[in-house]
Amino acid sequence: DGQGGFWPGIEKREVPDGASMDDYTLPQELLLPVAGPVTSGYGFRDNPVNGADDFHAGVDIAAAEGTPVAAAQSGQVVRTGYNRLRGYYIIIRHEGSVQTLYQHLSYIFVRGGETVTQGQTVAAVGSTGLVTGPHLHLEIILDGVRVDPMPSFPQLAA
């Protein structure tokens, strides 16, 4: 069929609505919120909690419980909250239709509506929600669509 890239007999998986595997360019540079190894990348994976084949809409960065989490860029806190999957989380809106989402936090130091600066400590790494251990789950949302954070943080690929 000329499409290539797929093994015969392997079914093509569709990226879920609200996510993209396409290349993108952000209007500003982002700061890595926490240093550590990537334990789960963006895209299709075997879920480490339940073994299901699913789409992971962010990257997981391992770090010790309580490690400070910095705002990737200046912006306004859209929402903070808790749910059983994300645990404690923060969404920050930045210029250029960019949002960053930080999940599985142990503590949140900011409130909805607050303005934050790049590098400001906004939370602490935790293991809340559906997790196997302490880490930061980080997502980048561009124009309402989740994109792979790895190209924005080349130090994660090292």
Where are these regions (language model features)?
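Surface-exposed, glycine-biased beta-strand/turn segments
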Residues: 2-86
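Residue-level recognition of beta-strand microenvironments
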Residues: 41, 80-81, 108, 125-128
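Conserved, short, structured surface segments that act as functional micro-motifs
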Residues: 88-94, 101, 114-158
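Zn2+-dependent peptidoglycan hydrolase active-site motif and core
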Residues: 54-57, 71-109, 134-135, 139
